[in-house]
Structures are given as C-alpha cells and as structure tokens.
C-alpha cells in the first residue's frame, strides 16, 4: 500500500492560485474589442505570409508596428489588400529590439482600450479559422473554472502541462503569437523588467509550483543532448508571471499556426500539438525524489 500523499492535480493548483490572487473567469462578451500588435522588420516575404494567414479571418484590429529599413517593407502597410482584418494604425520606426517593440505594442493597445491584447510577429502563419478558435479558448477555460490570461493557436507539445477537453494548459507561450486578456496584458507590461529567466530557473519554478519536471535539454556541437543553464528571452517569463498572478496560459488542440523562421526541433521547440498525441512532449509529473535531488 502506498502511503505517500497524492500530488494535487495541476488544475487544482491553478484554482488555488486564482483564489489567492482573486482572479475571476471571464468569457468573451458581445462588443469586446480585440487588437493585435503586429511587429515587422523587413523580411517582406515573411510579413506577406503572416498577413495572408491572419486576414483569412476578421473580427479584430491590427496595430502595425514596423521597424523596417527597406523601402519595400515600409510601403507594405499602405498597399496590402486587407479583406477581413481591420488595420487600425501604423507606427513606423519602432526600433530598439524585440522587447521595445513588444512593450510599445502592449502599451498602445491598452491605451486604445482593447479588451483583448495580442502580439504577432511577422514570421508566424495561421490557418483559416484561427481567430474564432483562439477566442473560444477563453470560453473553454472559463467553463473549467480557469481564468485564462493568455491564449495561443501556436502550440508546441513540449510546452503543454496538461491536455483538457479541447484545449491545452501550457507552461510556456511566447511573443510570436499570443492573445492576453486585458488585465493579464497589464500585468506583463508592468512586470516586464522582472521577466528574465534561465532554463534552470524556469525548471525550478515549475518543479516547486506544479511538481512537474521540464526536460529542457539542448544539443551541443556534437549533436548530443545536454542539460545546461541558458539565458532565455524575456517572453519565456510571460507564463510563469501570469501563474503567479492567478492567470493561466492555454492553447488550441491541434496547433493552428506554424513558424516560418524556426522549424519544430529548433532550440526548445518540439513538434506542434496534434490531437492524437497527449503529453508527448517535455513535461512529466514529478516522482518522489529524495531530499536534495529536486531541481
């Protein structure tokens, strides 16, 4: 007979965090405004593909923040033939690196009063039907009693903590394709200087909070998989920060987007989420390790 205490379910830990933070579930409401900050810098072919995928669906606005140098790229916002999406604003010469562009985009969308605040980079391509599926994630989570702070249609198997009915609970959702509920976007913007994490610190975070092990091995020059502490870009800190404020990050099953620049298998990118594979990525519940052996 096993006398060891049963580990709490991930969903129960999430509900506890919500209670502590005082967050509440919210489904999208009629009249809610959705805006995406699209970041671009040259790479016109990538930007066109991103726009074509986005524009398959409507119901949202785009605030386009461009840092391009080339004349062709700078001209694109004025000539792209939008059919469904609404181009609300174009801002040129948004420079200083990706984090400055991200913060500018979040701040601008919040200033404009959007209820849902999104980020899309110009190297992600969505499938038709992506937008209603994205918005439905907030409703699916709310039906489970989950306060969804961030949702994505670009889902990697290795970033899933748990598969639910119709959606995944994720441990990592980056800036390439993400939609925040407005209060969650305000948290991220306010906490942006505190988002820095490394592979070791993010592993410790999830081991302590959710009792899951993240296998964040990387390949060295000889092709061998090794465990090493690597500094991560700031967007890796989005999801941990949201959990600490009572918000959950979720994704579609299956993934409805693909990355143009980095293929699946690139640094910490596993295969995209598919419906027939459950928790096939890099996350496992923790075994009862002896003291001192936890990450």
Locations of regions flagged by a protein language model:
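Hydrophobic targeting segments
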Residues: 32-38, 54, 60-64
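C-terminal catalytic/acceptor-binding lobe
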Residues: 5-22, 29-31, 46, 194-295
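Short, well-formed alpha-helical segments that are part of the catalytic scaffolds
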Residues: 43-56
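Short beta-strand-to-loop acidic/aromatic patch adjacent to the donor-nucleotide binding site
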Residues: 114-125
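A conserved acidic beta->alpha catalytic loop
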Residues: 65-76
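Conserved catalytic core of nucleotide-sugar-dependent glycosyltransferases
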Residues: 98, 127-220
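Glycine-rich, basic loop-to-helix element that forms the pyrophosphate-binding segment
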Residues: 92-109
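Conserved donor nucleotide-binding strand/loop of the catalytic core
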Residues: 81-96
């Amino acid at each position: 007979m096993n006398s060891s205490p049963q580990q709490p379910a991930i969903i129960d830990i999430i509900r506890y965090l919500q209670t502590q933070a005082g967050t509440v579930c919210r489904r999208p409401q009629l009249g809610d405004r959705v805006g995406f900050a699209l970041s671009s810098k040259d790479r016109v072919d990538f930007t066109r593909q991103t726009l074509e995928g986005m524009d398959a669906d409507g119901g949202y606005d785009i605030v386009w923040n461009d840092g391009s140098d080339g004349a062709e790229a700078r001209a694109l916002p004025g000539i792209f033939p939008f059919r469904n999406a609404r181009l609300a604003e174009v801002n040129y010469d948004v420079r200083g690196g990706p984090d400055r562009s991200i913060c500018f985009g979040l701040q601008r969308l919040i200033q404009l009063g959007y209820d849902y605040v999104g980020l899309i980079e110009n190297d992600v391509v969505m499938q038709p039907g992506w937008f209603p599926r994205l918005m439905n994630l907030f409703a699916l989570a709310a039906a489970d009693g989950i306060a969804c702070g961030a949702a994505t249609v670009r889902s990697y198997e290795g970033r899933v903590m748990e598969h639910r009915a119709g959606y995944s609970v994720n441990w990592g959702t980056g800036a390439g394709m993400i939609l925040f509920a407005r209060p969650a976007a305000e948290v991220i913007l306010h906490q942006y200087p505190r988002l820095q994490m490394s592979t070791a610190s993010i592993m410790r975070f999830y081991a302590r909070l959710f009792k899951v092990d993240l296998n964040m091995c990387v390949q060295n020059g000889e092709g061998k998989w090794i465990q090493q502490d690597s500094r991560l870009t700031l967007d890796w800190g989005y999801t941990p920060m949201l959990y600490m404020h009572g918000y959950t990050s979720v994704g579609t099953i299956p993934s409805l987007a693909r990355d143009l620049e980095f293929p699946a298998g690139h640094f910490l990118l596993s295969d995209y989420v598919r419906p027939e594979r459950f928790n096939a990525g890099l996350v496992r519940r923790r075994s009862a390790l002896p003291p001192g052996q936890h990450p």
